[in-house]
Amino acid sequence: SNVILADEINRAPAKVQSALLEAMQERQVTIGDETFKLPQPFIVLATQNPIEQEGTYPLPEAQLDRFVMKLLIDYPTGEQESRIVQEAAGGPGGRGLDPGSIETVCTPDDIIKAQAACVSIECVSAVADYAVAIVRATREAAGISVGAGTRGAISLIRIGKSYALLSGRAYLTPDDIKRAALPVLRHRITLSAESTMTGMTQDNTLRAIVDSVLAPRQ
């Protein structure tokens, strides 16, 4: 499959998480003595239940670092929720959501072309240095016990390039890096116990860090 959805990944035992880590890092899976290359593109999406922690297996930092972004999904708007309820409750037996009705919006080749277009976005050294400075600041900031690694800076630039592409630009700007900072870094930092007790969050901490790092002139 080109797209894998690991639902409530923190409920998967360590052995399953390890297998997923191999797939994400090596782009291959090993079954017994055989190794199978994965198709391209290969995209992994995973969900976590932030409320129910009983019976879960916390993901190790090395595996969290393999995920490019962490998105926070809130409740839908009233209009969206009404549509969900109507569609889910419609049809025979109340099963109105028919998987067969899903329309294709892009092909694997389309994704590969989009990835190539992102790679071609220009990133001058000043903007790359800015991304590195933000990541390095997470390692020195008060209230953070574990800061982001080098993969965090790489992901900042990659996601920043995707924002530039979606904005119709052929070059990366500091604003693209700022926009990418929270989704790219929130799962890559660990707050100290003292910070957590005072009500600090990853997002609040990262906003303060981004504000403190001088951005290059555009």
Regions found by a protein language model. Name each.
Residues 1-5:
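Conserved alpha-helical scaffold flanking the Walker A/P-loop in AAA+ ATPase domains
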Residues 8-16, 24-121, 161-166:
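Canonical AAA+ ATPase core
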Residues 59, 80, 122, 126, ...:
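Alpha-helix N-cap and coil->helix boundary residues
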Residues 78, 82-86, 128, 132, ...:
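An amphipathic alpha-helix signature
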Residues 96-153:
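Conserved AAA+ ATPase small/helical "lid" subdomain
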Residues 113, 138-218:
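C-terminal engagement/docking regions of AAA+ P-loop ATPases
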